[in-house]
């Protein structure tokens, strides 16, 4: 019998959301994504101690550079076991500084360049703030492709598409978490607010012929993944990938480009900064989850820096 994972791979590019090389190798995804939380987990793994030490040794005491060197080293190892791309994230504390985001992105891609990794195998991850989207717009024009993450609202998705970013990562599970806590309802199937958000974005992009790739992220259960089967890409934790690999039930495709036009309901165009900020202000869930996500990644970045700083002693 064919597993649901193999069925999913027929119409969706499957991406592993992990820095675990062994798990990636066994599950055979096309791409992989990392973030500060996953890098912190990798840095705490004794198997990566040598890599962590080398990142510090080559940084001349610059802890921020050491973190970037470690992120790129993890990315290099991942690229040995995936045929596609790896996403490497910029320090979340820079999320509201366009110029700083551009500079840090250029440093990351420069480290990949120095390691002999072609740019078409790397996506630079930025939080989908207004400043992050503007940075991505500039980077894309300069040949550096981006992945806009921590995306919780339709306004973020529209702004990203209009900026010509390569890929967005709209979150499913964190949206579900917020609504479940807010309403007390345990949403399932197509009623899941996270599923509805990604479906709306996917349909809008296809109906308007936007080329930006939609990669659903942050899943809490298999049903959320199944409801988005057919999305351009889905980045999935190793635990859920393993469950998909073990399930031999039938998987039905839910999202298709040819049906998207029938469900088009929004025609927002040329979103201005004031419109973007107002839409964000009016969406309590998106405002709270974006801020929370940036804070969480910033704290994990600080913990990673502390690990590297300890090597100075």
Swiss-Prot record:
Keywords: Cytoplasm, Pentose shunt, Schiff base, Transferase. Pfam families: TAL_FSA. CDD domains: Transaldolase_TalAB. It is an enzyme of class 2 (transferase). Pathway: Carbohydrate degradation; pentose phosphate pathway; D-glyceraldehyde 3-phosphate and beta-D-fructose 6-phosphate from D-ribose 5-phosphate and D-xylulose 5-phosphate (non-oxidative stage): step 2/3. One of its GO terms (cellular component) is cytosol. One of its GO terms (molecular function) is transaldolase activity. GO terms for biological process: carbohydrate metabolic process; pentose-phosphate shunt. SUPFAM superfamilies: Aldolase. The active site is at 125 (schiff-base intermediate with substrate). InterPro entries: Aldolase_TIM (IPR013785), TAL/FSA (IPR001585), Transaldolase_1 (IPR004730), Transaldolase_AS (IPR018225). Its EC number is 2.2.1.2. The keyword DNA-binding does not apply. It catalyses: D-sedoheptulose 7-phosphate + D-glyceraldehyde 3-phosphate = D-erythrose 4-phosphate + beta-D-fructose 6-phosphate. Gene3D superfamilies: Aldolase class I. It is found in: Cytoplasm. Homodimer. Belongs to the transaldolase family. Type 1 subfamily. Transaldolase is important for the balance of metabolites in the pentose-phosphate pathway. This is Transaldolase. The lineage of its organism: Bacteria, Pseudomonadati, Pseudomonadota, Gammaproteobacteria, Pseudomonadales.
């Amino acid at each position: 019998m064919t597993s649901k994972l193999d069925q999913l791979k027929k119409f969706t590019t499957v991406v592993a959301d992990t820095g675990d090389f062994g798990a990636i190798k066994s599950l055979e995804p096309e791409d992989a994504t990392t973030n500060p939380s996953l890098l912190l987990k990798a840095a705490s793994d004794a198997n990566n101690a040598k890599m962590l030490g080398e990142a510090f040794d080559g940084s001349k005491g610059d802890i921020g550079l050491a973190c970037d060197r470690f992120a790129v080293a993890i990315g290099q190892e991942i690229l040995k076991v995936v045929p596609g791309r790896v996403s490497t994230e910029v320090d979340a504390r820079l999320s509201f500084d366009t110029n700083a985001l551009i500079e840090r992105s250029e440093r990351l891609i420069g480290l990949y360049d120095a390691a002999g990794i072609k740019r078409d195998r790397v996506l630079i991850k930025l939080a989908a703030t207004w400043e992050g989207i503007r940075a991505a717009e500039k980077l894309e024009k300069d040949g550096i492709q981006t992945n806009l993450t921590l995306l919780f609202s339709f306004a973020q998705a529209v702004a990203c598409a209009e900026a010509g970013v390569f890929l967005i990562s709209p979150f499913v599970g964190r949206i579900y978490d917020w609504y479940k806590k807010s309403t007390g309802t345990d949403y399932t199937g197509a009623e899941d607010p996270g599923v509805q958000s990604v479906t709306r974005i996917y349909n809008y992009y296809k109906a308007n012929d936007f080329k930006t790739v939609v990669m659903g992220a942050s899943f809490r259960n298999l049903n959320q993944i199944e409801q988005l089967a057919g999305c351009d890409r889905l980045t999935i934790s190793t635990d859920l990938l393993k469950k998909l690999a073990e399930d031999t039930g039938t998987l039905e495709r839910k999202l298709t480009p040819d049906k998207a036009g029938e469900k088009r309901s929004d025609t927002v165009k040329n979103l201005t900064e004031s419109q973007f900020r107002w839409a964000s202000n009016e969406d309590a869930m998106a405002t709270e989850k974006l801020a929370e996500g940036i804070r969480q990644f910033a704290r994990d970045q600080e913990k990673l820096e502390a690990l590297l700083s300890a090597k100075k002693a």
